């Protein structure tokens, strides 16, 4: 068991200074700091105590868009990004990842993706994934996305299917609807999220295909989950309307250059809240391990950076520096993705919830990281490393 004392808890709601008891991967007890649980002597002897001395304690971050196998490959095999190692996430306060395939869903496929998800789980990280990739028809493990979702526990939805992008397979509205229908029905059958996670490129068509799919079908708007919606300012304005219509939209925490026609995740989140759009229908992800690419007018790769899970905590710091409270800023990184993905025991600090916790230092960095009750980072030092980390 693990007793955490004197934690300034944001659940995401601010609860004040509390003590917590963790055991069996769960939060067993949560009480005021002045209260100490009267444990039997045998349990006291086996319990570890961490005194946070008033440090802020938040739910572990849920990163809903991660290239766990590595992304890239748009300029030859040498540009394929290596797989992401465990501490790349834990040191950044990320306790849950959702893996996916991007442009390269040929050299990399669902078998490798699923194996990487299982490997991360064995190393202590919470991990799930989407089936499919950028292209239509999608790559699958069982022969169809529908049966992938029904029979493979780790698959939560379909994605990331590319639209409004020169790298996409230029799917039609009917093709998009068939995928959305498969995701929706599989979600009904299994209780999974059953969402269609859609990569948005820089194309001027923007969210037109999603709007048409919603208007022309009976499929609920919540099934359609577009990401990268802050990459163009006009696209972001479209995303506000889509959120009002019932979709959850996802911001990407990527770097934005001065004068670029884009919003940082912090800027976009501030604008989103100011717009009055539903606060529960916005999430932020990192695109960790993905290729943050720039292309020339001929569609050739001009430059690339690699997405980092550290962008999530950096965005949280920027939001607070801009005057937003931690209580308001946290849900898009915690409870909102948990709700979208139907991970009912995650994204919150409450009795019975999974013990996925991050203590922040004064600078907003991850001081202590706990996943299902196991300490991975303590005093900013990695204490649990991945299999091939030194």
Residue ranges, per PLM feature:
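Histidine-rich, glycine-flanked metal-binding segment
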Residues: 1-2, 9-58, 382
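C-terminal cap of metal-dependent C-N hydrolases
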Residues: 7, 24, 349-390
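Divalent metal-coordination and catalytic microenvironments
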Residues: 7, 20, 25, 54, ...
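Metal-associated gating/positioning segment near the N- to mid-region
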Residues: 42-47, 52-115
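Active-site gating loops and adjacent loop-to-helix segments of metal-dependent hydrolytic enzymes
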Residues: 71-72, 76-80, 84-100, 148-169, ...
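Divalent metal-dependent hydrolysis catalytic cores, especially in the metallo-beta-lactamase
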Residues: 84-137, 152-166, 188-202, 222-227
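Active-site core of metal-dependent hydrolases
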Residues: 181-293, 301-302
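His/Asp/Glu-enriched, well-ordered alpha-helical/loop segment
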Residues: 274-359
